[in-house]
Amino acid sequence: MDNWNSVRNVSSDRQTSKTSENPPHTSNEYSGKPEFINLSPDLEENLDEKLMSAFPGLEPHVFQHSQSPLSHKDASLLATMPSVASSNPSLISSGSSQTGSPSQSLSSNKEPSSPGISPSNDSQSQNTNHTSISANPYVNNPSHTSRNPDSGSSLNTASHEVPSSKSDVNVQMLARLKSKSRQKISSSDPLEDLRLTLTECLNPINIVQAPKECAAILVNLMSNITQDDQKLVFLDLLKSKVGNSIYSQLVDGGRKLFLPKLRNWFVSAIRSKHDELIHLILLVLANLPLTTEKLAEVKFGKPILIVKKKSTNSVIRQLAENLSELAEKSFTIEQNRENEKSSTKNDSTVSSSAVVMAPAGPAMAPSASNKPSASSTTKSSNSKSKKKVTSISGTSFFKNLASSTKPTSASSSTKAPLTKQQTNPSTPLSSIMAGLKGREKEKDKDSGISSENVSNNREELPSFRKRSSSSRQSEEIASLQAENAVFSSDPASNDEKTGNKKRKKKSVSWKPDNDLVQVKFIESLNEEGAASVKTPHIYGNARDMDRQEARVAFGSHVEDDVENEIIWYKPVPIKFEISKDEIHPRGYKCGGNERNLTPEATSEIEREKNESKDISTFNIILDLPVIREFDDSRPPAHIKLVSSDTQATTELGFNGLVQQVSENNTNAYSATSNSQLSSIFSNLSSSISDASSNVLQNPSLSIPNYSNAI
């Protein structure tokens, strides 16, 4: 608290010294320096109430007056101690408007952001008076923020003077913004960069002094904005009433690109069903000075009517309803223009492919000469030559459209010879079409004129080549003559005057029977018809044949109708005499009780029994005790040790050992046969090992030492 008091005293001393040196201005001229005034607590409270009443849909924290320029602690201190605020004018900054009247505002270092009004909010927000937040030129403008070295906080003060005329506008800042708007947004925080650029551009001073330049900057920014969040920031700052001058420049500016770009955003939002973006665009449209002609130029009426009809949001539908009257009128203008364009296009298409025809009308005397007079160039002239057309047989359709003129007098009743005369190749297509239409009308009225005579009265198609000025004049003359050329309703008089030959009617007639050269008699064969009718179709068609066959096989209809039936006869008896040995000539190697044992099979069985049998399973070996007990009645066995000195001694000792062992075991193995001797000798080594183990277990056994005897 002491630190804050010291800062307060220092700032108040500085302010006192400044005010004493520079007395306040008495005139309405803006000096460019901030003026500090003392705000009483009553004035502060009244200001909050006025702001809350002016903005009923916003939160209290939105107002800059309720935010402290220093910190949250100082803000609470100013709220609880209004006397401190009144005694410290350095904490409160005020900027004057263009008229010189002071306005009180407090702002923090962080610029306040108004909450976006979403379509889901209460409809009461639509009736909110969108008062400009930027009424003070230094609010929401980061370029006017200065740093207080004593308190370390930022205060909103004026950093440049307010221009008194248009020549004093900060040209450098506008040029910088214009060049920046032409570049793509590529910073680390594009939304913040866009917000700062728009805030500088929508500064009231710049809007009033240079609205054209500001509108150009906004249009350039719209060209570089591609993301929906950037569009929301742009429209959110533009929807508030920043000034009628900027709106009129955006709509009626030189390039007039704002409304087309805004329509593209609107159509894109409708397709992606972005309700928030649609809502902001409708709010911007509500502030623009729009007319039906301006909406019709960019075709903005139809999207508004679509949103009004198909939107599911009530707020959006209400905003579209407010603009529906203008939208309907503009849409009507659009349709009328499209109809005019289509009709003009159709007229030009039809006139380019038309053929001139001489219309029927009252007879008119031809002129003495084929050359038209000068008075025949106007529609009011009465002397006009009569133009007659004839058909030439033996040519194609287009070549047959030739016209000829015949100078005949009214009293002559004889037909003049036919002459061929081509029309001027420079006949205009409009006159050709007029002749066609007139000819069709007269043909419907005059039922007496036959179709043959009508088809003969056609002119030749014009050749497409470069036309001269004289040919154009002859075109007009020919068109006027074609309009007034008439034919008599009497076919006879018409033929006499035109000299056309009456074409014979083509008909088909049959000769009598006597004149027929060939007669063909066609008779029907009843047999074939009867046979085809009586043919039974049991299976229906080939597709259902398999199913029909199945029904025949498994149904009551057992007989086969396809095969021919033959008379049954008794078959010849067949005698089968087969011996028992022939039934199984090769025999069975397996098969149970009926197995035929052959000598080979018997020997195989015996071999298999001994092949898989283990030696240790012999009954004789299993019956012998593993360890034989010592018998005192028998003399001990004397086993001579094998000497390694001589071979004879080894052989003698081994034979003697075998002999003694065989003698001692004669009684034990007396029952063995000769076939088992081989197995006994094979187990001799095991018996010797058993004997040695017995000697170790029974100390009474003694092996004599024959070393001395040897």
UniProtKB/Swiss-Prot annotation:
Disulfide bonds: none
Cleaved signal peptide residues: none
GO cellular component, one term: cytosol
Region (Disordered) location: 1-42, 85-170, 361-510
Record's compositionally biased regions (Basic and acidic residues): 437-447
GO molecular function: RNA binding
Compositionally biased intervals (Polar residues): 1-30, 109-170, 421-430
Subcellular compartments: Cytoplasm; Nucleus
Claim: RNA-binding is one of the keywords in the record: yes
Biased composition (Low complexity): 86-108, 361-383, 401-420
Subunit annotation: Component of the cleavage and polyadenylation factor (CPF) complex.
Task of the protein: RNA-binding component of the cleavage and polyadenylation factor (CPF) complex, which plays a key role in polyadenylation-dependent pre-mRNA 3'-end formation. Involved in poly(A) site recognition. May be involved in coupling transcription termination and mRNA 3'-end formation.
Listed name of the protein: Cleavage and polyadenylation factor complex subunit C74.02c
Protein source organism: Schizosaccharomyces pombe (strain 972 / ATCC 24843) (Fission yeast)
